[in-house]
């Protein structure tokens, strides 16, 4: 005769404390979640306050920007955008186009040169490869100010000052060691069996790089694109050194010129143009943030 194997029902004395503790545990977790979310909201507002203040000040009259620090404006105007649109005799869209040319060229230069350099350091076998890679890593710790004077002397002797060449040419020479290191770490994670299989089929190093390595490097390439665009668009020091004519000014240099020309009462004008200069960055980051997070998670920064 079959016998039942069901466990005996727990005693009432055992379930009562658990049933009584369950609601209190849920309330405790709910309170903890509310406190964490409130803290995150307050921290987010604290971090966004300068951006919010700048956006509000862009629509305030210049005489109220510093005298009326409230977030809710008492008077709105568009005169700051009208007054700041012309800088040095040129409309502001000229500076946007100059920054776009420099940023896009820098992206292309870094993608081409850094990917080739990283592939050579990660895959090709040649003498002193580790020494070259160590030199690349050392340049990461070398401040820009240590090399800016020799670079300026070279470009000045070639007559390239006041052009975009000093800002673009180094990108095609793999001078951004951070991206080289990023791509080297990513390529080292790609199985070498893929290279060996391609070599058996007769593919050379460049064919392996173009047909196998490069398509698999998409996360690292996207990360390089995003960081290069942000850093180039916001660069001020290098562009200030090489660009002296208003016709080739980029957005950061134009904002600096706006401060000089409107230093008496141009705070609202500066806020208005600064707000416009942030729009490309915000749009670019909004569309690329998913790829940025994925790229960081799958490259050498993880």
Where do the model's predicted regions map?
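Short, Lys/Arg-rich, polar N-terminal cytosolic tail immediately upstream
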Residues: 2-29
